[in-house]
Swiss-Prot record:
Molecular function (Gene Ontology), one example: glycine hydroxymethyltransferase activity
Pfam families associated with the record: SHMT (PF00464)
Pathway involvement of the protein, from the record: One-carbon metabolism; tetrahydrofolate interconversion; Amino-acid biosynthesis; glycine biosynthesis; glycine from L-serine: step 1/1
Alphabetized Gene3D superfamilies for the sequence: Aspartate Aminotransferase, domain 1 (3.90.1150.10), Type I PLP-dependent aspartate aminotransferase-like (Major domain) (3.40.640.10)
Protein name (Swiss-Prot/TrEMBL): Serine hydroxymethyltransferase
Site (Plays an important role in substrate specificity): 230
Length: 425
């Protein structure tokens, strides 16, 4: 009898199994520095690959449109209860399929087409769903964007207030995809109160840090908080809506179903519940602290090697390297680090002269490799590996050396060591 899922899949669909096995090997052999990626536990994988995928369950626990939901109700309620405990929220909806779906449900609940929303410009570290013209949020609503201060490359709350007073948005959005500093939610609350706006925090990137107290929580300041459940939270890919207002919570529930989704993905919801349970344990708090320590170690090493970082460093899990300091584009740097089995992503920097397809920046993050057990000394070594190869501009001898150093780190900190590779037939 086969004793793991890959062996089962190889028996039934060897073509797909070989692809999945190849991806497992890629994850094992590469240093993952994409700030939005992480490695879930095998317990999360088990829940997501369970028989719960077979069940339709439109509605909410004990309010379903289908029969046979007694175990589904228990699984979803457990996930809800754990999410509320983890973040200190009065209400949680665990059904959004993604962070984008969670954000759109909030828009449906609070806004009408043509209303004004205000969020950070995508090129400064915002997100597509915060009013980018290529996203539905930028097509259905009037959008005004704020950015960072050109001198400090940090949020300028006085400038944000001035823009908010001028534009009077109905919804003010804070929370970002490429901002390496602490967000002061209390200052956003004061601005929202002054203009009578709803305040939404999208903490998709920092949710794990918020849950463990390593970043200030927005729950007591914001009308609604959205997040993904992967990234620093280390769960399955999915979304979550949180609020301290039970009445608003009912509106968000309706906006998710039937407003924007049909049947929830209960196997993913169960996996979210497992991840929330893991995040409630002391080990996860220690992990979150190490994520920040590792990020700062990598940032310090890169700056020591002469690289400029946006805002001069980091307070969280990510950093933005401004490659103009070495005369390189983000596209080129992304290609070069991939040649030595390091995975990152090109990224715009504030006031970037390059297009989004080229960029002047490289975004790096610490969550995934921290999950593998690496600490500050390993992240300093990673900083040196990146610096050595980028500064060499792809020299073959340096490439050979860097590949060996990357392999050494991957071998010392194995990924999913208990997960067997299936025999190719």
């Amino acid at each position: 009898m086969p004793d793991n899922n890959l062996e089962i899949l190889f028996q039934h669909d060897p073509a797909m199994a070989e692809i999945i096995q190849g991806e497992l090997q890629r994850q094992r052999d590469h240093l993952e520095l994409i700030a939005s990626e992480n490695f879930t536990s095998e317990a999360v994988l088990a829940a997501q690959g369970s028989v719960l995928t077979n069940k339709y369950a439109e509605g909410l626990p004990k309010k379903r449109y289908y029969g046979g939901c007694e175990y589904i109700d228990r699984a979803e309620q457990l996930a809800i209860d754990r999410a509320k405990e983890l973040f200190g929220a009065a209400h949680a909806n665990v059904q959004p399929h993604s962070g984008a779906q969670a954000n759109f449900a909030v828009f449906l609940a609070l806004l009408s087409p043509g209303d004004t929303i205000m969020g950070m410009d995508l090129s400064h570290g915002g997100h597509l769903t915060h009013g980018s013209p290529v996203n539905v949020s930028g097509k259905w609503f009037k959008v005004c964007h704020y950015g960072v201060n050109p001198d400090t490359e940090r949020l300028d709350y006085d400038q944000i207030r001035e823009l908010a007073l001028k534009e009077r948005p109905k919804l003010l959005i804070c929370g970002y995809s490429a901002y390496p500093r602490i967000i002061e939610f209390d200052k956003f609350r004061a601005i929202a109160d002054e203009i009578g706006a709803y305040l939404m925090a999208d903490i998709a990137h920092i949710a794990g840090l918020v849950a463990t107290g390593h970043h200030p929580s927005p729950i007591s300041y914001c009308d609604v908080v959205t997040t993904t459940t992967h990234k620093t939270l280390r769960g399955p890919r999915g979304g979550l809506i949180l609020t301290r207002d039970a009445d608003l919570g009912k509106q968000f529930d309706k906006a998710v179903f039937p407003g924007t989704q049909g049947g929830p993905l209960e196997h993913v919801i169960a996996a979210k519940g497992v991840a929330f349970g893991e995040a409630l344990k002391p080990q996860f708090k220690a992990y979150s602290g190490q994520v920040i320590a590792n990020s700062r170690a990598l940032a310090a090493q890169l700056m020591e090697r002469g690289f400029k970082l946006v805002s001069g460093g980091t307070d969280n899990h990510l950093m933005l390297v401004d490659l103009r300091s070495i005369g390189m584009t983000g596209k080129e740097a992304d290609r070069l680090v991939s040649e030595i089995n390091i995975t990152a992503n090109k990224n715009t920097v504030p006031f970037d002269p390059e297009s989004p397809f080229v960029t002047s920046g490289l975004r790096l993050g610490s969550p995934a490799l921290t999950t593998r057990g690496m600490g500050e000394s390993e992240f300093k070594e990673i900083g040196n590996i990146i610096a050595d190869y980028l500064l060499s501009r792809g020299d073959e001898a340096v490439k050979h050396d860097c590949l060996g150093r990357v392999k050494s780190l991957c071998d010392r900190f194995p990924l999913y060591p208990g997960m067997k590779m299936a025999a190719l037939v």
